């Protein structure tokens, strides 16, 4: 069998890893072995945090809605329950945006929800 040399394959693989390691500090950017370890770890973090981001944003939206609800003399849980009873199908992302940027519209929604309570 003919001898197989890995020059081209290795160079491509190293370039791919070192390209992903751009922005890392010191040896984690320049040395292949350290860069490979750090890239593997960073890809795991990326995968995990893409899921955590959804949780974090939902939590942020709830905090914002709760703060705006308290200004309108209603608790968050009662407000969400009243929205469901009133068949107002706005998600938390939209409600949080209204609470932050359009207080009058949010107050109108709260008034509609209070009618059903």
Swiss-Prot record:
GO terms for cellular component: ribonucleoprotein complex; ribosome. GO terms for biological process: ribosomal large subunit assembly; translation. Signal peptide: none annotated. Keywords: Ribonucleoprotein, Ribosomal protein, RNA-binding, rRNA-binding. CDD domains: Ribosomal_L20 (cd07026). Belongs to the bacterial ribosomal protein bL20 family. The keyword RNA-binding applies. It comes from the Bacteria. GO terms for molecular function: rRNA binding; structural constituent of ribosome. Binds directly to 23S ribosomal RNA and is necessary for the in vitro assembly process of the 50S ribosomal subunit. It is not involved in the protein synthesizing functions of that subunit. It comes from Campylobacter hominis (strain ATCC BAA-381 / DSM 21671 / CCUG 45161 / LMG 19568 / NCTC 13146 / CH001A). Pfam families: Ribosomal_L20 (PF00453). The keyword Ribonucleoprotein applies. This is Large ribosomal subunit protein bL20.
